Amino acid sequence: MTIDNDDANPLAPADLPGIDATTEVSRVWGHIGAIIVDATLQRRQNYHTTVKPRVVALVAAWPDADTTSGFRRRLDTGKLSDVISWPSPGRLAQVEDITCVFERQGIETVVELQGTLGDPVKRSVLREALASVRHVSPKTLDYIDTLSGVSASAAFDVREHGE
C-alpha cells in the first residue's frame, strides 16, 4: 500500500534498518537526573530488571530533577538511595561525582548536554572530565551519548573528526 504523502512521513529512528528500538529509543531520557543515574547503574546490571525500573522511579518521584540544579537540590536531601532503592554507597558516590562534572561544565539541561556532545572541543573536555570519575569507562561515555539522544553515528563523526 502506498500513501501519497510518504516523503512527508520519514521513518522514525526505530523504523530504520539496523536500529534496535529497545536499545536506541527507550534509553533516551529528557531528564538530567535520569541520564546520570542510568549511566551510573548500568555497569554489570541487567537493564530491564535493575536499571530501568529505578530510573523510571526517579523520574516519577523527582520530576524537577530534569535539570542539573534540580537534581542537585534533590541529591542534597540525601534521599536518592531510597528513591531508587539502591543502598550501595559506591554507585551513589559516582552519581554525585558525575553531577559535579555537569555542574563544573555548566551543563544544566539535556539540550545543553546534547549541544556539548555535538561540539568537538566541548565534547572532548566533557569526556575527559567524566573519564576522571571512578568507574566511568569509554563505554560509559558512549552510553551517555545514547541516553541523551545523541545518535551513535553523530557521536562517531565527532570522535573521528574532533577527538
Regions found by a protein language model. Give the residues of each.
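Short helix-capping/linker segments at secondary-structure and domain boundaries
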Residues: R43-P53, F102-V110, V150
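Structure-specific DNA junction-binding interface
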Residues: M1-Q94
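Catalytic DNA-binding helix-loop module of base-excision-repair DNA glycosylases/AP lyases
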Residues: T40-L41, G118-E163
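Amphipathic alpha-helical interface surfaces
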Residues: V51-R54, R91-Q94, I98, L126, ...
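Alpha-helical ds-nucleic-acid-binding substructure associated with the helix-hairpin-helix region
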Residues: A60-R134
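Flexible domain-boundary/linker segments
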Residues: L58, E112, V158-H161
